Design a protein with these regions (language model features):
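Hydrophobic alpha-helical segments
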Residues: 1-177
Length: 177
């Protein structure tokens, strides 16, 4: 059976450019397996470093992990990224989201009012490129209890998710495992 091949080379610690090795070794040191996505990014040390730094900084932000997962699921669904939908289904469950919330998040929705409002804001970012989200969505997010810091992090998570889906789609990156 022929397996799907990526348009980009999927590197590991033996084939990656030297500038990518510190990040790859760090990822492998956690005992996990290197994802195909990181293997592709390793082809450009600058891109891998930028992604790793951006993601690392956002992990230390104020946006709850469940919110981050919901945003990533919604963007992956909107962008049609099977790679990320497969990966995020697992990580969302590990973050404590139930199957019902995962399904809702994929549609920019949630049973939790505050999360639903934030996802509507994220949806406006994704579906109206070149335009600011309507002011009422920004105001609704604030009224739902989201701070400016969390709203800015939402914008950042949307951009990180868009970048991730663009890489996997443009490279036709096969699912892990």
């Amino acid at each position: 059976m022929k397996t799907k091949e990526s348009r980009f080379h999927i590197h590991d610690e033996l084939t990656a450019p030297e500038g990518s090795l510190p990040i790859l070794k760090g990822a492998l040191s956690t005992g996990g397996q290197l994802s195909n996505f990181l293997g592709v990014l390793a082809g450009s040390p600058a891109v891998l470093r930028a992604y790793a730094r951006f993601r690392s900084e956002l992990r230390h932000g104020e946006l709850p992990l469940k919110s981050q997962q919901r945003i990533a699921l919604a963007v992956a669904q909107h962008q049609g990224s099977e790679y990320w939908l497969n990966t995020l289904q697992r990580s969302a469950r590990e973050a404590g989201l139930g199957l019902d919330e995962i399904a809702l998040a994929r549609e920019f929705d949630s049973r939790d009012h505050a999360e639903m409002v934030l996802l509507r804001y994220a949806k406006a970012l994704v579906t109206t490129p070149g335009a600011a989200p309507p002011m009422h969505l920004h105001e609704e997010a604030r009224e739902a209890g989201w701070t400016d810091e969390q709203i800015l992090e939402t914008v950042a998570h949307v951009s990180l998710s868009l970048f991730s889906t663009l890489v996997t789609r443009s490279g036709d990156v096969p699912r892990d495992g």
